[in-house]
Swiss-Prot record:
The keyword Transferase applies. Keywords: ATP-binding, Kinase, Nucleotide-binding, Phosphoprotein, Transferase. Widely expressed; except in skeletal muscle where it is expressed at very low level. Expressed in erythrocytes. The keyword Coiled coil does not apply. The active site is at D217. The modification Phosphoserine is found at S20. This is Ketosamine-3-kinase. InterPro entries: Fructo-/Ketosamine-3-kinase, Kinase-like_dom_sf. SUPFAM superfamilies: Protein kinase-like (PK-like) (SSF56112). One of its GO terms (cellular component) is cytosol.
Length: 309
């Protein structure tokens, strides 16, 4: 690994440090180089490059908003012996505690960033001879992302769609249900999904949804803080409904009331929020079912039963 990093990063010295870590999907280790300390994530799977390229694109997109801190990605490389590695900036992080409210506010800023870009473009359209100079980020009017991103190790279909309800049903829930059908042929799950599809449009009546750049997998294990404030990492980004972000945040804990107060101070709950939150949690329960097995079947079916009532 040291030789690979020396060659690919153009470093003269690379040395492994004592810092290592890992999650459910990949392992990581820090290295000291003459250009600074880097963190290297390693995954041996054949499809790891696609996963890491999606993560790199996600981190890059979040960085450009200048809203919430993420590690700066450096390069995706083929790993010696198979799989891939993602090299990124090393950050000294600790458990999120004193900066929860700041994270709530900054996450709302991330979700509002594209909306503000759109408002700015509209204003500029009526202004003659405005000064250029800085690179312009375009307003994103559709739902999706330029590359495949992975929530866990399963790829997400990010093809661009005009309509959020169509995007969410076809490109988030349907692929998960297809996997459930292929693996277990669970008839009850499939029948509930057929019934739920007819109900979904009712949950979005009279709701205007402007595409928001999402982290995409914001549970307590993917947030931390350093001396300057909150940090988020391991994203699976796409442009979607801001409410989607809060689904997995509420499933496994790790976020205090101050986080939610700060967030909703900037993005208030719209009518029907609680039911839509269940619909968004359904994706994550199905995704866990497909990753880790039928221990998540009961939660998946309960949500569908509640929503088809």
């Amino acid at each position: 690994m040291e030789e690979l990093l020396r060659r690919e990063l153009g470093c003269s010295s690379v040395r492994a440090t004592g810092h290592s870590g890992g999650g459910c999907i990949s392992q990581g280790r820090s290295y000291d180089t003459d250009q600074g300390r880097v963190f290297v994530k390693v995954n041996p799977k054949a499809e790891a490059r696609r996963m890491f390229e999606g993560e790199m694109a996600s981190l890059t997109a979040i960085l450009k908003t200048n809203t919430v801190k993420v590690p700066k990605p450096i390069k995706v490389l083929d790993a010696p012996g198979g799989g891939s590695v993602l090299v990124m900036e090393h950050m000294d992080m600790r458990h999120l505690s004193s900066h929860a409210a700041k994270l709530g506010a900054q996450l709302a800023d991330l979700h509002l960033d594209n909306k503000k870009l759109g408002e700015m473009r509209l204003k500029e359209a009526g202004t003659v001879g405005r000064g250029g100079g800085q690179e312009e980020r375009p307003f994103v009017a559709r739902f999706g992302f330029d590359v495949v991103t992975c929530c866990g190790y399963l790829p997400q279909v990010n093809d661009w769609q005009e309509d959020w309800v169509v995007f969410y049903a076809r490109q988030r829930i349907q692929p998960q249900m297809d996997m459930v059908e292929k693996e277990s042929g669970d008839r009850e799950a499939l029948q509930l999904w057929s019934a739920l599809q007819l109900k979904i449009p009712d949950l979005f009546r009279d709701l205007e949804i402007i595409p928001a750049l999402l982290h995409g997998d914001l549970w307590g294990g993917n947030v931390a803080e350093d001396s300057s404030g909150p940090v988020i990492f391991d994203p699976a980004s796409f442009y979607g409904h801001s409410e989607y972000e809060l689904a997995i945040a509420g499933m496994f804990g790790g976020f205090s009331s101050s986080f939610y107060s700060a967030y909703h101070g900037k993005i208030p709950k719209a009518p029907g929020f609680e039911k839509r939150l269940q619909l968004y949690q359904l994706f994550h329960y199905l995704n866990h079912w497909n990753h880790f097995g039928s221990g998540y079947r009961g939660s998946s079916l309960n949500i569908m039963r509640n929503l088809v009532k």
